[in-house]
Amino acid sequence: MMLEHVLVLSAYLFSIGIYGLITSRNMVRALMCLELILNAVNINFVTFSDFFDSRQLKGDIFSIFVIAIAAAEAAIGSAIVSSIYRNRKSTRINQSTLLNK
């Protein structure tokens, strides 16, 4: 696969993630869009690692670290969302004013 094709795919994923993060009103959807952004970054790491220096796996290893951090972020984020849903009965971002009380 050519470098430009993979970079365009990654840019599309990143753009969809940013658009979804900006326009989402649901916390679960915002977490999913954040995962899209992190996956687009991982695609770039692996692509540039393969394209520039295939003998060293620096981009691949860094991508594994980003995947581990994304998994922890998803677990903690879903726990926070479920806790907010139990207390507020809603996962809408504009209705969660936890800092006002």
UniProtKB/Swiss-Prot annotation:
Q: Where in the cell is it found?
A: Plastid, Chloroplast thylakoid membrane
In which broad location class does this protein mainly occur, judging by the first location in its UniProt entry?
plastid
Q: Which GO terms describe its biological process?
A: ATP synthesis coupled electron transport; photosynthesis, light reaction
Topology relative to the lipid bilayer, per the entry, is:
Multi-pass membrane protein
Alphabetically, the GO molecular function entries are:
oxidoreductase activity, acting on NAD(P)H, quinone or similar compound as acceptor; quinone binding
* UniProt xrefs under InterPro entries: NADH_UbQ_OxRdtase_chain4L/K, NUOK/Mnh_C1-like
Positions of transmembrane segments = 2-22, 32-52, 61-81
Please tell me whether the keyword Translocase is annotated for this protein.
yes
Show the catalytic activity.
a plastoquinone + NADH + (n+1) H(+)(in) = a plastoquinol + NAD(+) + n H(+)(out); a plastoquinone + NADPH + (n+1) H(+)(in) = a plastoquinol + NADP(+) + n H(+)(out)
Return the GO cellular component terms, semicolon-separated.
chloroplast thylakoid membrane
Q: Does the keyword NADP apply?
A: yes
Q: Which UniProt keywords apply?
A: Chloroplast, Membrane, NAD, NADP, Plastid, Plastoquinone, Quinone, Thylakoid, Translocase, Transmembrane, Transmembrane helix, Transport
List its EC numbers.
Answer: 7.1.1.-
User: To which protein family does this belong?
Assistant: Belongs to the complex I subunit 4L family.
What quaternary arrangement does the UniProt entry report? NDH is composed of at least 16 different subunits, 5 of which are encoded in the nucleus.
Biological role stated in the UniProt entry: NDH shuttles electrons from NAD(P)H:plastoquinone, via FMN and iron-sulfur (Fe-S) centers, to quinones in the photosynthetic chain and possibly in a chloroplast respiratory chain. The immediate electron acceptor for the enzyme in this species is believed to be plastoquinone. Couples the redox reaction to proton translocation, and thus conserves the redox energy in a proton gradient.
Protein name listed in UniProt = NAD(P)H-quinone oxidoreductase subunit 4L, chloroplastic
